[in-house]
Regions:
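Hot-dog-fold acyl-thioester-processing enzymes
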Residues: 1-78
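HotDog/MaoC-like acyl-thioester-processing domains
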Residues: 1-7, 87-118
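Glycine-rich loops and low-complexity Gly/Arg-rich segments
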Residues: 36-41, 76, 85, 100-102, ...
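Mid-chain, well-packed structural core segment of small domains
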Residues: 67-95
Length: 118
C-alpha cells in the first residue's frame, strides 16, 4: 500500500474576500469590532479602513487542509499563526500547505502553511 502523503506534496486554496464574508463572519462569531464592520471608525485606525478578521483568512488554511491536502476526513490538531499584514475586502488570499513530515504508522503529517494576499 502506498503512503497517503509524501514529503514535499503541496496544495493551495485561494479566495477573494467579500463584504458578505466579513459581515457573515462577524455575525457567526459575534466579533463586530469596528475595524471590520464600520468604515467611518475603521478609517481612523492605523489601517486607514476596514480589514477582514484575521481568523477569517486563517480559515482558508483550514479549507486547504480539509478539502485538498490531506483532504476530506482530516482532523486538524494544532496551528501557530502570525498575522503580518491586514486583509481587506477585495483582496485575494491564497493559503498554501506543504507536507514537511509524514508518519504512515500514526497517519499524521506536519505541514508548513503560508498565507499570501494580493
Amino acid at each position: 500500500m502506498s503512503a497517503l502523503l509524501q514529503v514535499g506534496q503541496s496544495a493551495e486554496f485561494a479566495k477573494t474576500v467579500t463584504e458578505s464574508d466579513v459581515v457573515l463572519f462577524a455575525g457567526i462569531t459575534g466579533d463586530f469590532n469596528p475595524a471590520h464592520v464600520n468604515e467611518v471608525e475603521a478609517s481612523k485606525s492605523r489601517f486607514g479602513g476596514r480589514i477582514a478578521h484575521g481568523i477569517l483568512s486563517a480559515g482558508f488554511i483550514s479549507a486547504c487542509i480539509a478539502m485538498k491536502l490531506p483532504g476530506p476526513g482530516t482532523i486538524y490538531l494544532t496551528q501557530s499563526l502570525k498575522f503580518t499584514r491586514p486583509v481587506r475586502i477585495g483582496d485575494t488570499v491564497t493559503a498554501r500547505v506543504e507536507v514537511l513530515e509524514w508518519n504512515e504508522g500514526k497517519r499524521r503529517a506536519r505541514l508548513a502553511r503560508r498565507r499570501s494576499t494580493s
